[in-house]
Amino acid sequence: MALKIYNTETRQKETFTPIQPNKVGLYVCGVTVYDYCHVGHARVMVVFDTVVRHLRSLGYDVTYVRNITDIDDKIIQRALENKESIQSLTSRFIDAMHEDEKALNVLRPDMEPKATEYMDEIETMISTLIEKDFAYPAENGDVYFHVKADDDYGRLSGKNIEELDSGSRVEINSVKKDPLDFVLWKASKENEPAWQSPWGDGRPGWHIECSAMSTKCLGNHFDIHGGGLDLSFPHHENEIAQSECATGEHYVNSWMHCGFVRIDDEKMSKSLGNFFTIREVLKQYHPEVIRYFLLASHYRSPVNYSEENLDVAKASVGRLYSALELVPADQAEPAESKLEAEFMAAMNDDFNTPQAMAVLFELAKEVNKQKSPGLAALLKKLANQIGLLEQTAESFFKSQPSDSDLTDEMIEALIVERAEARKAKDFSRSDEIRDELLAQGIELLDSAEGTSWRKI
């Protein structure tokens, strides 16, 4: 089955055909680095990491670009509040972002352009838009894109100019020609960073940054552009307008958007203050559990964040690892099975990870039934393609976050003491040790080979 991707612009699934045979250019809007990443950011990271993994499994040579917004009103404000330099603030949170995504087994993008490193490209694009009468300098030193000069504006969101006009606020004494116009260049203010330009010192607007970076890294016309659903309008709509008016070429073939992570029916966001950072959640749940939770819903659907749903994810990942616990996955080549074709068909159907995971559970059931190392190897291989089952079962079960103060050595010592108690027929002490460990979230598993343990 050929790969099909739901294109936000056409509102339908389309068979994916790359612009250049066997090559894919993918650009994703990344994080504005003024705070720690939250679970909403994690979803975008994990979803597009999974998209890239699948494209590569199909044999495509993928160039994955995910930008970093390192200059922005929020960044400036946070740096002032913290009494630290913008460079210090953004460097700190870029490092934190990389730590978080590494924990979630998210592979680093091939390119990670920062807005502040692309000022020449931004200036060139703005100059081109002014020359072509799609943009104009205002009397206050700002530069604006003139929305009504672009006859095609609104095609991604399905909004037409009349609708936008009726919903726009009348601005008194505005320097804009029209309330719909958006900023490309902001004139500098006191105590704000600024770059020189033909229109005076200032800094770029958010939308133009992505147009300049994406076209510089991938060319004027590339295959896939992704991001969160909240970016489809106005950010991505404005990107299309700027890019196509500047270059005269079609900008992007396929637009992909992730649904929101929600808490109590509200989008998780820093501005609403209802967010959980990735590192907060990592204190409670194993990274693979968080990754599984984010992939258990189709990427276009909303995800409801709750401990109950994360607990379900924890149990589900545990079931998959349990299938590998007694059947070695590293001692055989992956077996042939129709389930592999079913897994690939699910992923080729607009990256349907819930259906692909259902196939993994079917495969786990067969591993448990047949005790086949070949099927275990296949389970691990397919799960790895979506970034799961990367550890050994023993390592997974022993590395769950826990409130217990017991070290591995202390647990092993208690297991030895329990074995001696059982040998001496002191079953009271044996049960006491088992219960003691269970109370600390440690489960003992007795078998013919001896006693093993796991965190629960």
From Swiss-Prot:
It catalyses: tRNA(Cys) + L-cysteine + ATP = L-cysteinyl-tRNA(Cys) + AMP + diphosphate. It comes from the Bacteria. ATP binds at K270. A motif ('HIGH' region) lies at residues 31-41. One of its GO terms (molecular function) is zinc ion binding. GO terms for biological process: cysteinyl-tRNA aminoacylation. This is Cysteine--tRNA ligase. Disulfide bonds: none annotated. Belongs to the class-I aminoacyl-tRNA synthetase family. Coiled coil: none annotated. Gene3D superfamilies: Cysteine-tRNA ligase, C-terminal anti-codon recognition domain, HUPs. A motif ('KMSKS' region) lies at residues 267-271. GO terms for cellular component: cytosol. Its main location: cytoplasm. InterPro entries: Cys-tRNA-ligase (IPR015803), Cys-tRNA-synt_Ia_DALR (IPR015273), Cys-tRNA/MSH_ligase (IPR024909), CysS_C (IPR056411), Rossmann-like_a/b/a_fold (IPR014729), tRNA-synt_1_cat_dom (IPR032678), tRNAsynth_Ia_anticodon-bd (IPR009080).
